[in-house]
């Protein structure tokens, strides 16, 4: 008779610190697995606490509560399958990132994370102790090896588990999204399968946490490297995977394969889910934003409507004497197509009042960016008042290009609690708007069709803080600016390297200077979803005071 083993993969969305709620989700998955005849129900890395916890796991009281919650969960796991779930483990030897296996009312095994990532968004070397490579776990007919997340990115752990008799690799993860990550995971895990000859189940969590998105997209590889099962990206899923022992090895029975979305859709889904979860997990259900008639605020409004429904999106137009009729018309047109509320609050009176109050202080000076920024800051004051009064989170709308070079006003258009575009360059803003106009998915809560007026996409970008202003008065064309920024930020290239690629040296050096002198602004900027390898927060940590410039 052929040996069989059923694993329920629970690709779910935990909340950091919500121990009881996360345990309840785990038990619901366990009950679903029990009803389906599973032998093991698996949840992702650090699921009980949520992930990433950052310094929360350095707090003894939190670790105490997490350990108590795990013990209480174990007591419930009776008369059914084993439950594998991530959570911290503390003993006299240290504090570990562990994957616990619970069965028959007790803890039957733990796999401790061996390789602690200390790059990009991770600082696990300061949070956890390095665990030894755990022995394979025997569950019924199968010997299960458990490399925890980063462990699968190195050949030694999987190799040691295979040498110790593991027959299947179960990899629980908290692997955050960035562009290209889905393909990279397949390459890395495919290498582990090729090295060991073992099938591999890759289980990732899903959901937003602060600036990070966990995109799910879990999968199962057979010993020949073929994909047997592929779970959806960016949504919860509970899937039952059947393993069968053949003459030579265990193999997964092929089942549903959900094709991953394309690059633009992945980024867009990340922005929508990031906003959705940041609000939900923070206790908000509505947003407010300044709708200028420009492309950035238009895209943020649509992202918000797709995440929350248009009825929970409050748009506010805040015109001054410099606001064009075209911008007024475009903002109204977008709100109408979206079905969102639009209010208009004039700022000309407040602007005149502030400038009048400052007249004796500024006497003898020529108007400059100071007066322009008063307009932006007045808008921030008004929007924050609406946010406070109605309990709606204020969204800020600056794209990565603007945030990179400081083309934004601190305490003005930077005011807000979350920025969906923080890691999206301006050229990609245009691409994303065109894509959204041509695309609709069942998970989008806003209407289908050409929801962003073409006039908004086609007109030259402008802050409209003075007569006849365009962004290109102060910046190179966005195609040039973004190409230079990607080389400086994501590529860490030198000035010489960028010039060798065909860019003007003076322009490159100016952009480099703007990037460095804007660090203090970014330090005070709202969080936003990480889409690239170098988002402006944990990925890229530069000093605010920095006199060095590349002289190459």
Swiss-Prot record:
EC number annotated for this UniProt entry: 6.3.5.1
Top-level taxon in the UniProt lineage: Bacteria
TM region(s), chain numbering: none
Ranges for domain CN hydrolase: 5-245
Listed GO MF terms: ATP binding; glutaminase activity; NAD+ synthase (glutamine-hydrolyzing) activity; NAD+ synthase activity
InterPro entries linked: C-N_Hydrolase, C-N_Hydrolase_sf, Gln-dep_NAD_synthase, NAD/GMP_synthase, NAD_synthase, Rossmann-like_a/b/a_fold
Record-level GO cellular component terms: cytoplasm
Keywords noted in UniProt: ATP-binding, Hydrolase, Ligase, NAD, Nucleotide-binding
Residues noted as binding ATP in the record, renumbered to the chain: 290-297, 397
Region (Ligase): 275-552
Pathway: Cofactor biosynthesis; NAD(+) biosynthesis; NAD(+) from deamido-NAD(+) (L-Gln route): step 1/1
Binding site for L-glutamine: 175, 181
GO-annotated biological processes: NAD biosynthetic process
Family according to the record: In the C-terminal section; belongs to the NAD synthetase family.
Protein's recorded name: Glutamine-dependent NAD(+) synthetase
Organism: Rhodobacter capsulatus
